[in-house]
């Protein structure tokens, strides 16, 4: 028999109790409802022993079962909303395996397929090989995903991200500027919304920021995605927010760094494509504190920028402490990508050929970047 991993179990128990406490009252019309979901991206877990949540939303008596013995549920029956802890045993085989989870309430039945990768395999993320995507941290609690819209009859990435569920904060977001995505066709939408790709238990909300005295600071800025109204709306997902100090950071130095990168995104002489990565530091030793429902407040913020023009590359980065600034010059916070990697522990632009990556990341010449 396999056991729950202690660290994840404690976290899951805490979140389970908070979810159960939010159970809805019985439906006043006497109609029994049933909905189920898993807290893992794509209903897929790693090949190691791992815990997950089965989230059950119902106003009736439910029963749950799993088709295979390598997956166990901590509870198989109950009444009303519940978050059930599931555990999978290691998968030492060479192939992915799957099992069916079934929940019934009266004559209603819902099923989910849970997939488990083979040990040693990497998470499935369709855009992991793109130039702007950093090396993934991976693991079941780090969700890598992309948001898309249809723009000019073409599927277009708004931004990609890796979201840390334990910190309730994005590790990084990444996107590109090129001719079609650097134009302005719309204005700020203020379409604040939950990110549908983040499990409910790990989402953040307005009070997580405002009640703690922070603003909702965009990582992918609203002004970064003004080529399309639908793309701009996606920048207002709460997964794209970070708790930032107000006018003297979010509305000051950070805003000015964003504006500078946006100007480069429009600069035809600088780029065919501009690859941008932004984020706040959320490793344990680089967090100021936690606020609200457990949202990490980064101690530092960063941007990594790579310009490609006629198959020639150059790169630079910004790294800035999260504090109030009364005066500043953003040039003072410009560094090489190599230096940013040392400070953040993130491997940027690793999908470039090694010789190109090494050359562009070790050098930074501010004279190559207009207005810096």
Show which residues each predicted segment covers:
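Short, hydrophobic beta-strand segments
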Residues: 86-92
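Domain-level detector for secreted/extracellular nuclease and nuclease-toxin modules, and
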Residues: 23-29, 98-102, 115-372
